[in-house]
């Protein structure tokens, strides 16, 4: 047995499923998950000594690559001053100033510890501000594991074949209305059925939890218009897309102005950080200035703030997003060319530093139904053969891939060459 296999066997006796987040267990592809020893740049190194070109990037945060010196040094320096104070720090102010400067639609921002906390808190705030209970989300979109959001969710819920989770009371779920991503007609129908009851729409501007599904040109502006028409708030979940699709997020890339924005992943530079923010009048409803309660023992933790501050300053440097786009475009085009040579039907969606691989005869993948029609069994074989080639992709057909600026063009070309060999075996 390999060291990963031994560790996984031990872990399953102590940790449910052997992992602390379900998709890591390789449930969606089968086999034994890799246990990682270290990471640097674009590479992961497992406990058995094998190196992999990494396109998971810790599920999105590692836009600069692993073990970036600016982030590592910031964490070390902050740790020398203390790990947690439970009181305000200067770095929280600096971090809030940086985030609101980078994302102009955020007049104010509240730091939390995860993307789930950010979306959960933003929805509570929207409900409190509007005095309404219902929310709209979209099939296949995942916004964390808060009870009200585990309805036709994507990501790990799809990987496990459970779009709805046991343990979520029907009384909670009844306030969550589910519409079809990229379909404004379904959204209007929900508003017309409940014209005075919908507090907000929450949407991934690029659906990254049913792999990678970009919005159609009219979709996000249409959501903004419907929210304005019916008096609801628009919450854009930029946990994946924030600082990745563009410096100011997908909202800037697609030209839509939300009322609230949720952030995570890149904002922490690899540390557990989330944030939500937006219009000043809405944020003023949040405790302690307003009646909507939200709190966190470790929110604004000095180590995490130092990591995030260092990361965002690096991400804001000129040329970062152009590099991400160039690398991702080359990968997507190269994979499609290699698949075509082998007679394998393939669609690769990509936006900025995100991409999604779909084994499908369809010309495009634009919604949940398109994703569910893809060949998951072929993806499983592709995943394991690529792993043997030293390429680490997301271990699920329903998870997006992530590029970093630490990837070189040689890494991309080597990945395409590996895929060419793999396609010949599929």
UniProtKB/Swiss-Prot annotation:
Stored PROSITE patterns: AA_TRANSFER_CLASS_3
Q: Name one GO molecular function term.
A: glutamate-1-semialdehyde 2,1-aminomutase activity
Cofactor field: pyridoxal 5'-phosphate
Q: Which organism is it from?
A: Salmonella typhimurium (strain LT2 / SGSC1412 / ATCC 700720)
For the keyword Coiled coil, the answer is no
Alphabetic keyword roster: Cytoplasm, Isomerase, Porphyrin biosynthesis, Pyridoxal phosphate
Q: What is the first-listed, main subcellular location in coarse terms?
A: cytoplasm
- Please name the Pfam families in this protein's record: Aminotran_3 (PF00202)
Which reaction is this enzyme known to catalyze? (S)-4-amino-5-oxopentanoate = 5-aminolevulinate
Q: Might you give the EC number(s) for this enzyme?
A: 5.4.3.8
Matching entries from NCBIfam families are given as: hemL, PRK00062.1
Kindly list the biological process annotations in GO that this record carries.
Answer: protoporphyrinogen IX biosynthetic process
GO CC entries: cytoplasm
Give the protein's recorded name.
Glutamate-1-semialdehyde 2,1-aminomutase
The family line of this record is:
Belongs to the class-III pyridoxal-phosphate-dependent aminotransferase family. HemL subfamily.
* Subunit and partners: Homodimer.
Please name the pathway. Porphyrin-containing compound metabolism; protoporphyrin-IX biosynthesis; 5-aminolevulinate from L-glutamyl-tRNA(Glu): step 2/2
Q: Which residues carry this modification: N6-(pyridoxal phosphate)lysine?
A: 265
Q: Where in the cell is it found?
A: Cytoplasm
